[in-house]
């Protein structure tokens, strides 16, 4: 009596996954070995914070915010000011110890020429720390 194996010589229904597993393991090993080599680490020696720097930060004067509108109007800490009064206030602020930083806030449509003039006035009066204030874009 002969038993049939049930295979009538038709197509094989099972997929042989052994070669796939072998290839995947080789790729995994390659990635594990090369991943540390791909990260370029730049060695930077960062400064260490100490108590003296903290005390210096507490002694700083409050910053001055100077807003410039499109039409050239100026606002000293949200109060309107003329260019003539601006020069006298800047020279007074420049003589303070410690000198307060000047933050320029320009309207989006303000011409760069106007901002440049105000920066020159501030530097001419002796302001050392002049910065610009910008808002972060909504997409970032």
From Swiss-Prot:
Residues 38-140 are periplasmic. One of its GO terms (biological process) is protein transport. GO terms for molecular function: transmembrane transporter activity. It is a single-pass type II membrane protein. The keyword Metal-binding does not apply. Belongs to the ExbD/TolR family. This is Biopolymer transport protein exbD1. It comes from Xanthomonas campestris pv. campestris (strain ATCC 33913 / DSM 3586 / NCPPB 528 / LMG 568 / P 25).
């Amino acid at each position: 009596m002969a038993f049939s194996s049930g295979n009538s010589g038709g197509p094989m229904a099972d997929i042989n996954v052994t070669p796939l597993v072998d290839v995947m393991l080789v790729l995994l090993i390659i990635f594990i070995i090369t991943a540390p080599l791909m990260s370029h680490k730049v060695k930077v020696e960062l400064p260490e914070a100490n108590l003296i720097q903290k005390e210096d930060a507490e002694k700083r004067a409050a910053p001055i915010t100077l807003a410039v509108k499109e039409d050239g109007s100026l606002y000293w800490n949200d109060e309107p000011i003329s260019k003539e009064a601006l020069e006298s206030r800047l020279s007074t602020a420049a003589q303070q110890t410690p000198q307060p930083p000047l933050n320029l806030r320009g309207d989006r449509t303000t011409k760069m020429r106007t901002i440049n003039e105000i920066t020159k006035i501030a530097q001419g009066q002796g302001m050392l720390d002049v910065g610009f204030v910008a808002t972060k874009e909504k997409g970032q």
